[in-house]
């Protein structure tokens, strides 16, 4: 007779199989900092559903490897030491805030070019450390992964997938100038009403703004092709042993998970293999730590203002910090400021400094009146989720783009970090808190965000699992990938039709001339005969 323990073990095994449904292996090519915080949410959900998730890790300080996360981390054996992602991001933040505003256009372009060349060198080291390490590649190949989830900020994830012959899924906010989405993913980007990233334009553009939008697009395309993709075209061809391009490899992505949604974006065309999953990391607020809750409650009817420039900018110049502190001291609200620098001399009694704050929980607190933010996508979506109006202090990357969108939708005001005065910042903070329209618009966006048939996180996980179940999603890939640029724009058809029109016009003209000539000759002959008779 079978023992009770054996029966229990049998049923437990059945439950495990039933709970998993199908358990697959996921390889992850991540990016660090705020990108990782977003991607981690997807990976934790995949792990919770029984999938085996392996993250390829290079030197970083943000990627959390604690045991509570159901992920496996595989360290990349680097050929030589590279700068950490945090240091690189702090460097570009310093350039954007403190250096570039004081340079001429030419000097700024040269400074940025030098910086990005250093970053490209770091990325090349990561790529070679993986792709040219046969033992490491064999280890990945033997693991038989079902999909690669890639953040394309760091190149070569798609190259690893190509070498291993594994389908891959992208997760990104955008590429510079939408270059990858447009040229590699074939996503239509009509410049007449789709503002290019970092142009700070809306979908309602004047003629001058459309010219600016076009110039931004051309500038990004020239910059990327000349100083970035040309290098990677050569590297990808060298690695694969055949002529190819970076864009051609990127274009093989099965699904593009875009970290935005129509609450932030303006309406524009998209393709069936592009899925908008903005705000997937957002969640209901949890109770605050006791000391922080007491400080928030002490604000009374005035409420609190949350101030954070994100994980990238921990310190400001002393002058800028004193300016901000003096402004915050003039408002009746209590202020929770995430700041790691020297305590400003002008700091008011209503302001408290923190090395870290539970941002989502604070934004979800009923006493929060406004959010002063750098405009990162994660923070923007947490504010939208909880319906909190914003004062944007953008610096780089997607931040100016995000704040421009929020300002156009009436949920935020923008001030410039490099040129703002105390009057500018104070006016913006007071307006966002005291004018009802900002709160109303923030709540409207919040209702739009919450009113979705399927939650963003569930959509993201569904499409990754879809790719694993079907070994790809090539049926969603448009035929534009197989067309040349002149075929895509139907220039050959237009040329053929123009040739037909010209040919037909030529034939008709010749025929008319021939008829006219015959009639003229006939009339001339009649006139000649009449003259002879006379």
From Swiss-Prot:
Disulphide connectivity of cysteines: none
Keywords: Glycoprotein, Glycosyltransferase, Membrane, Signal, Transferase, Transmembrane, Transmembrane helix
GO molecular function, one term: glucuronosyltransferase activity
Organism: Mus musculus
Membrane topology recorded in Swiss-Prot or TrEMBL: Single-pass type I membrane protein
SUPFAM superfamilies per the UniProt record, alphabetical: UDP-Glycosyltransferase/glycogen phosphorylase
Tissue distribution: Highly expressed in liver, with lower levels in duodenum and jejunum.
Protein name as catalogued: UDP-glucuronosyltransferase 2A3
Transmembrane segments: 494-514
Keyword Membrane set for record: yes
Cytoplasmic side: 515-534
Domain of life: Eukaryota
Modified residues (N6-succinyllysine): 135
EC category: transferase
Reactions catalysed according to its record: glucuronate acceptor + UDP-alpha-D-glucuronate = acceptor beta-D-glucuronoside + UDP + H(+)
Cellular component GO terms, alphabetical: membrane
Keyword Transferase attached: yes
Subcellular location: Membrane
Signal peptide location: 1-18
EC number: 2.4.1.17
Family classification: Belongs to the UDP-glycosyltransferase family.
InterPro entries in the record: UDP-glycosyltransferase, UDP_glucos_trans, UDP_glycos_trans_CS
Positions annotated with a glycan in the UniProt record: 102, 204
């Amino acid at each position: 007779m079978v023992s009770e323990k054996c029966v229990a073990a049998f049923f437990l095994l059945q439950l495990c199989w039933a709970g998993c449904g199908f358990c697959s292996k996921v390889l992850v090519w991540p990016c660090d900092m705020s990108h990782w915080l977003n991607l981690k949410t997807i990976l934790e959900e995949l792990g919770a559903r029984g999938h085996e998730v392996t993250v390829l890790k290079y030197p970083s300080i943000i990627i959390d490897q604690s045991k509570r996360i159901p992920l496996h981390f595989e360290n990349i054996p680097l050929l030589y030491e590279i700068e950490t992602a945090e240091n690189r991001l702090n460097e570009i933040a310093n350039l954007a805030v403190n250096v570039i505003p004081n340079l001429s256009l030419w000097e700024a372009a040269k400074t940025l070019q030098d910086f990005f060349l250093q970053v490209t060198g770091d990325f090349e080291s990561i790529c070679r450390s993986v792709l040219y390490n046969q033992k490491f590649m064999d280890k990945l190949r033997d693991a038989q992964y079902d999909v690669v989830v890639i953040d394309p900020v760091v190149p070569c994830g798609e190259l690893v997938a190509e070498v291993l012959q594994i389908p891959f899924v992208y997760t990104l906010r955008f590429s510079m100038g939408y270059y990858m989405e447009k040229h590699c993913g074939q996503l239509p980007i009509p410049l007449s009403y789709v503002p290019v990233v970092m142009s700070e334009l809306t979908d309602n553009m004047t003629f001058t703004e459309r010219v600016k939008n076009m110039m931004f697009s051309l500038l990004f395309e020239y910059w990327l092709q000349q100083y970035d993709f040309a290098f990677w075209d050569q590297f990808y061809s060298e690695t694969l042993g055949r002529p190819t391009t970076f864009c051609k490899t990127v274009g093989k992505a099965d699904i593009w998970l875009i970290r935005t949604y129509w609450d932030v974006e303006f309406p524009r065309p998209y393709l069936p293999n592009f899925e908008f999953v903005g705000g997937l990391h957002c969640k209901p607020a949890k109770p605050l730590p006791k000391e922080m809750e007491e400080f928030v409650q002490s604000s009374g009817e005035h409420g609190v203002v949350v101030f954070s420039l994100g994980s990238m900018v921990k310190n400001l110049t002393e002058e800028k910090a004193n300016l901000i502190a003096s402004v915050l001291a003039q408002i009746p609200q209590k202020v929770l400021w995430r700041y790691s620098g020297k305590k400003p001399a002008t700091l008011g009694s209503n302001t408290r400094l923190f090395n870290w704050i539970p941002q989502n929980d604070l934004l979800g607190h009923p006493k929060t009146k406004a959010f002063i933010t750098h405009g990162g996508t994660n923070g923007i979506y947490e504010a939208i989720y909880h319906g909190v109006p914003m004062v944007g202090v953008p610096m780089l990357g997607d931040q100016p783009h995000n704040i421009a969108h929020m300002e156009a939708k009436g949920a935020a005001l923008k001030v410039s970090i490099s040129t703002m005065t105390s009057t500018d910042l104070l006016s913006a903070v007071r307006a966002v808190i005291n004018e009802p329209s900002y709160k109303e618009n923030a709540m409207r966006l919040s209702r739009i965000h919450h009113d979705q048939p399927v939650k963003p996180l569930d959509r993201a996980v569904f499409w990754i699992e879809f790719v694993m179940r079907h070994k790809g999603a090539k049926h969603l890939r448009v035929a534009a990938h197989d067309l040349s640029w002149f075929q895509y724009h139907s220039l050959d058809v237009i040329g053929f039709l123009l040739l037909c029109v010209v040919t037909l016009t030529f034939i008709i003209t010749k025929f008319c001339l021939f008829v006219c000539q015959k009639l003229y000759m006939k009339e001339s002959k009649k006139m000649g005969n009449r003259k002879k008779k006379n």
